[in-house]
Structures are given as structure tokens and as C-alpha cells.
């Protein structure tokens, strides 16, 4: 096929990569910070502050994927069948992906996992965005507070080592 007839890419590449397997989700659940509201739970792991774990020839998959210049953050969506049928679940996933794309600068260097609840479907996009921004800024403030405590040598209940 001649080069003149080839279509150019019409969509820009997405700034996130998805969490792929159970071990990646479990790492965010166990080591990350979490926040809950009646509509969804948000788990956040700051990968920029965490040193990559390297064993014999094994590289940390989460940290390595962020070193790629096109990938700003990692996103995981865990939508249960209790939330609704496939149409409802997919609508929620599209909205959450769109939210993270819209606020990609806030999500930079993070691994995010969303766990929506059944009431999440009844929210419109703007209400969902409001709850997402409140939770994300609260978690980021919490993480900064914990990091400052660790630098000073103070171990609080919110500071993870």
C-alpha cells in the first residue's frame, strides 16, 4: 500500500497503562493508600516515591512501566457484577477512564485502582468528577504528610514504611 493512502493515527496515545494481573492489583491494595465514599473506593500507590525492587534478573513491572515517557500513570478498574449488567459496568468504566484522562496531571506517577459500588451508576459525570477530585486530593495530601513524617524519622499510623 502506498504511503500516501495510509491513514494517520487519528487518536493520540493514551497517557496511562492498565494494571494487568492480580499481583499488580494486590500490590496497590496492600501498599497503597485507600479512601472510601458511598459511590466508590479509591486505592492509590505512589510509584515515583517507591524504589523499584530488583532481584536476580527480575525488574519491578509497575515502576518499569512508568519509566516509559508515554505512560504517566497506571489505572486499574475492578467493577463487580453486583454493580449492574454489562451496559452499566461499561458506562462506569468509560466515565472513570475519562476522568483520569481529564485530570492526568494529578494522576502522574501513581497507580490507581477504582472499585465502584452500585450507587456509582446513578451519579452523573460531574458529580463523579467532584467525588474523584475530593478523594484524590485528600489522598495526595495524606501521602505527602506521611512522606514528611518518614523523612523526619517520625512513624505515625498513617506513615507506611
Swiss-Prot record:
Superkingdom of origin: Bacteria
Ranges that cross the membrane: none
Keywords: Endonuclease, Hydrolase, Nuclease, RNA-binding, tRNA processing
Enzyme class name: hydrolase
Assembly description: Consists of a catalytic RNA component (M1 or rnpB) and a protein subunit.
Free-text function comment from the UniProt entry: RNaseP catalyzes the removal of the 5'-leader sequence from pre-tRNA to produce the mature 5'-terminus. It can also cleave other RNA substrates such as 4.5S RNA. The protein component plays an auxiliary but essential role in vivo by binding to the 5'-leader sequence and broadening the substrate specificity of the ribozyme.
Family: Belongs to the RnpA family.
Name of the protein this chain belongs to: Ribonuclease P protein component
Organism: Helicobacter pylori (strain Shi470)
